[in-house]
């Protein structure tokens, strides 16, 4: 079921989040190695996009793990406790992603209501 989610390109108007993350990976690695003052100046543009990409990828991978664990539990190859742990972790990750989405939509609506 979750395997149908291949990418999150619908979140970007022109390209998927994966390409944004690959474009900015060198800037992020340079920012980690540098001082805080230079990191703020060099990667402030791409940091939000890379964080959002990582959150989306983490959410999808956690949901896939929970789905695989539930199938393993049905087959009897995984204990009930492990299945419940994976499903609860996926539920918590999904609730976090939903809360993040709601905050982003709320912030966008606040920005659109501002007078110019």
Swiss-Prot record:
One of its GO terms (molecular function) is cytoskeletal motor activity. Its main location: other. It holds the Pfam family FliE. It is found in: Bacterial flagellum basal body. Keywords: Bacterial flagellum. GO terms for cellular component: bacterial-type flagellum basal body. GO terms for biological process: bacterial-type flagellum-dependent cell motility. It comes from the Bacteria. InterPro entries: FliE. The keyword Signal does not apply. Belongs to the FliE family. HAMAP family: FliE. This is Flagellar hook-basal body complex protein FliE. It comes from Rhizobium rhizogenes (strain K84 / ATCC BAA-868) (Agrobacterium radiobacter).
């Amino acid at each position: 079921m979750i395997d149908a989610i291949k990418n999150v390109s619908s979140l970007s108007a022109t390209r998927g989040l994966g390409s944004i993350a690959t474009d900015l990976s060198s800037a992020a690695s340079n920012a980690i190695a540098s001082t805080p003052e230079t990191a703020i100046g060099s990667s402030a543009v791409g940091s939000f996009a890379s964080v959002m990409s990582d959150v989306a990828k983490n959410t999808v991978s956690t949901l896939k793990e929970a789905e695989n664990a539930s199938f393993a539990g049905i087959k009897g190859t995984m204990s009930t406790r492990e299945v419940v742990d994976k499903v609860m972790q996926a539920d918590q990750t999904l609730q976090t992603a939903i809360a993040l989405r709601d905050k982003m939509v709320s912030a966008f609506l606040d920005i659109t209501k501002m007078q110019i």
